[in-house]
Structure formats: structure tokens, C-alpha cells
Curated annotation (Swiss-Prot):
Gene: NDPK2
Location of the active site: H199 (pros-phosphohistidine intermediate)
GO MF entry, a single one: nucleoside diphosphate kinase activity
Recorded family membership: Belongs to the NDK family.
Protein name according to UniProt: Nucleoside diphosphate kinase 2, chloroplastic
Residues binding ATP, per UniProt: K93, F141, R169, T175, R186, N196
HAMAP family: NDP_kinase
GO BP: CTP biosynthetic process; GTP biosynthetic process; UTP biosynthetic process
Main location: plastid
Enzyme Commission numbers on file: 2.7.4.6
Transmembrane feature ranges: none
Source organism superkingdom: Eukaryota
Catalytic activity: a 2'-deoxyribonucleoside 5'-diphosphate + ATP = a 2'-deoxyribonucleoside 5'-triphosphate + ADP; a ribonucleoside 5'-diphosphate + ATP = a ribonucleoside 5'-triphosphate + ADP
Amino acid sequence: MEAMSGLSSPCNCISSLPHSSSTTTRHQNLLFRRNNHHQQKLAAFHSQSHLFSTKCPLISHSLPRKKSFKPHIFLPHLVASMEQVEETYIMIKPDGVQRGLVGEIISRFEKKGFKLIGLKMYPCPKELAEEHYKDLKAKSFYQKLIDYITSGPVVCMAWEGVGVVASSRKLIGATDPLQAEPGTIRGDLAVQTGRNVVHGSDSPDNGKREIGLWFKEGEICQWTPAQAPWLRE
């Protein structure tokens, strides 16, 4: 019975064996190194909220930075005009008219809070299209663009509002609809650059020039909407 008792308690036998001081020291050093290595590995990871943050110095430099392909809608020369009342020219192109998008596009500008001060629809004469796009005359696609704009009726609009030029560019989206963000007119309603539905002035100066080009004297209507006090302080 004593022999069986001794066999059933091997741990007691082993623990009773004498340990040399060198063995104990090596064992302690091994435990210390393992614990230190474990702490270093834990220190490399912060809370999950910072795991993929560029503010984390231990991780942000090791992760490859993904290039952003989002189009920059706001041009530098438009930033200073964001608090000024401006006018801009918006044109719904023949494809937008043929697809029945006129109401949809006008609604987006109205919901934004801009004031429609000019509106008409007519077939675009070739001479007018060439004058409008004269800065693109040297481009290889120029003639194709003129043919497209004159292929059917266009809807010409003049809009007024605070920062209307830059905001309109944002509403319209990037020239290439495939790069335009969802929620923009082109991002939602177009798929190809050559059929991108709508045109918008790219600067306050061009807004004035294009309104003067497409509208005759007396065709611009100045009025005060009832909602004006609720749009601006």
C-alpha cells in the first residue's frame, strides 16, 4: 500500500527532490525572458479603436497607405466665395432632357436652398455651343462635344445663392460619373463622361459670363423667396 501511495503522488516525489542553485537561477531567468517578451508583444497592440488609426506610432508607419481616388470638387479659387451671394449657370444637357431628368435635377438645387432666377429650354445653336466651349477647342473631343450639345434641346438655368458656384459643383459631382460620389447628380444619374447629364459653371466669373451668354436682357427674374429668412442669418 505504501508503494502504491508513493506511485500515486509523483509530484510529491519530484517536489521533494533537492534543486541546485544554478538550476533555480536558470529557471527564473527563463521565466523572466518569457514574461518580458509577452509584455512587449502586448505593448504593440492598443485598444481596437486605435488599431488602424494613423495616430498610432507603432502601427501607422507599418501599414501601407492606400491612395485616395476621391475627386476634389471644391477648387481653391472657390473657397473664398463660399460666404458670398453669387450666380451660376446650370445646363441640363440633351441626354438629361431625353431621359426625363429635368424635374429631378431642378429639385436638387431647390432643396439645397438656391433661388432659380432664369429658366428656358431650346435647341442649342452650333455657334452658341462653340462659344460656350471655346476653351476646349484644342481638345481632340471638341467636335464630338459640339455635336452632342446640339443634338437636342437643353434646359438653361441661372441660380443664385450663398456660395452657389462651389456648392453646385459639389451637387453635380466629378466630370467622370464613375468617379463621382454617390448622392451627386452625376454619381446617381450618369455612367459615362460623354453623357454626364449636366453642366455647371466652375467659377463666379464664368457663372456671370455664361449667364450673359445664354440669357438675353430681361430674361433674368430677381425675386425674394418666402423661405429666405430660414436659409441665412
